[in-house]
């Protein structure tokens, strides 16, 4: 049983559920009702949360539901370090209202800044706090494995961190509560609160950018797993004969075969050894390709691009089929630029239909939130 719990963890669950009883909080964290009551009492005294309503009694005392006190809570500064090489910054309220947002392309930062991304985040926080003294909390979203209870970034394949103790570092420096979360789990919360899964009990969010990750909502709860590593779909080995090495050290991972980076590398390599493609001139001019170039090749039905992308969709279908077979979701939300292509979506569905069980009934669709998903994932 867990002995200690931070107020920020309680707030996160109250925000996620909208209204939640002390008993539900105790069950969520594996704590006694007395311990939960002690923490919630502090939050009630600070007027950060309020007793919103009384539920129906099942024989004993009726449950009292707690919710966030939007009027009391100060502004939240959110920083989202995504897998698509973009840094999204938002300033808003805990109820999801955003009144300031901007984004920074990671590739436009200097080499030193890219190698010390926490300093970049630190500079942003310092600047925003100096301009807005009403900021009362920080929310940091990052790719990879996150232990939000300890406030630690266990492993981020896309960012170099000088210290994994992200929460401790920023709480000490700014004397503000700091929430830390994995990027795809944050996306799942957004889809659950304002997206296509508001009334869906069981769903999967599958994110494809430079890397691949997923988040699973089971019976309306975001599932994290024993080590807070549930959802590492990118590291499912789907090609045991592969020579492509993944960032995790294994070969044949879904991420190494079908992420944006993997797709670009494959097509670039094929062009360089002499394979024909309409992207050859683009590669020669820019010396690199982007996922937009790949989608242009798909639109023009370039043979090489279609060949590589069809294989990528086949591997993605294999990975999704494993998730479908194990989790039996009602809906799958796809996040990533490649899913904007109807041709690729049709190809993915075709490949899934070939291997998935007929008894599985589910909807699969790209997120309807577009780029706003990254801004709201704070």
What is the meaning of each model-derived region?
Residues 76-80, 135-139, 203-207, 213-215:
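Short glycine-aspartate micro-motif
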Residues 57, 145-148, 186-188, 213-214, ...:
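Short, active-site-adjacent cap segments at secondary-structure transitions
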Residues 1-61, 65-105, 109-134, 250, ...:
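ATP-binding/phosphotransfer module of carbohydrate and carboxylate kinases, centering on a glycine-rich
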Residues 102-202, 343-354:
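Glycine-rich phosphate-binding loop and adjoining helix at the ATP-binding site
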Residues 96-97, 152, 221:
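Residue-level signal for well-ordered, solvent-exposed loop/turn and beta-edge residues enriched
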Residues 93, 148, 217:
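Short, acidic, Ser/Thr-enriched surface-loop or helix-capping motifs
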Residues 101, 113, 173-296:
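Glycine/GP-enriched mid-protein hinge/lid loop-to-helix segment characteristic of carbohydrate kinases
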């Amino acid at each position: 049983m867990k002995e200690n719990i931070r107020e920020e963890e309680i707030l996160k669950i109250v925000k996620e559920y909208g209204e939640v009883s002390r008993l539900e909080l105790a069950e969520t964290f594996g704590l006694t009702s007395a311990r939960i009551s002690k923490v919630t009492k502090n939050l009630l005294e600070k007027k950060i949360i309020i007793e919103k309503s009384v539920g129906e009694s099942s024989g004993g005392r009726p449950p009292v539901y707690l919710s966030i006190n939007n009027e009391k809570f100060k502004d939240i500064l959110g920083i989202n370090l995504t897998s698509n090489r973009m840094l999204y910054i938002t300033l808003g309220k805990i109820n999801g209202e955003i009144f300031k947002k901007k984004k920074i392309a990671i590739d436009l930062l200097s080499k030193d800044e890219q190698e010390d991304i926490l300093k970049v985040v630190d500079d942003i926080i310092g600047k925003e706090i100096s301009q807005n003294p009403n900021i009362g909390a920080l929310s940091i979203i990052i790719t990879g494995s996150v232990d939000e209870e300890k406030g630690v970034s266990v492993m981020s394949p896309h960012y170099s961190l000088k210290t994994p103790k992200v929460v401790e570092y920023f709480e000490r420096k700014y004397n503000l509560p700091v929430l830390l979360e994995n990027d795809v789990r944050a996306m799942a919360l957004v889809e659950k609160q304002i997206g296509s899964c508001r009334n869906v009990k069981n769903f999967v969010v599958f994110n494809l950018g430079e890397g691949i990750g997923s988040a699973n909502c089971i019976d309306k709860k975001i599932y994290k797993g024993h080590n807070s590593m549930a959802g590492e779909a990118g590291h499912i080995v789907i090609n045991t004969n592969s020579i492509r090495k993944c960032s995790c050290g294994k070969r044949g991972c879904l991420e190494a075969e079908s992420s944006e980076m993997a797709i670009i590398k494959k097509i670039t390599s094929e062009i360089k050894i002499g394979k024909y493609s309409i992207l050859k001139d683009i590669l020669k001019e820019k010396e690199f390709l982007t996922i937009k170039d790949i989608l242009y090749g798909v639109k023009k039905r370039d043979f090489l691009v279609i060949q590589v992308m069809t294989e990528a969709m086949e591997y993605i279908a294999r990975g999704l089929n494993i998730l479908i077979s194990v989790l039996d979701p009602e809906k799958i939300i796809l996040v990533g630029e490649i899913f904007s292509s109807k041709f690729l979506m049709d190809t993915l569905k075709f490949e899934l239909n070939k291997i998935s069980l007929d008894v599985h009934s589910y909807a699969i669709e790209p997120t309807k939130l577009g780029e706003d998903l990254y801004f709201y994932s704070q």
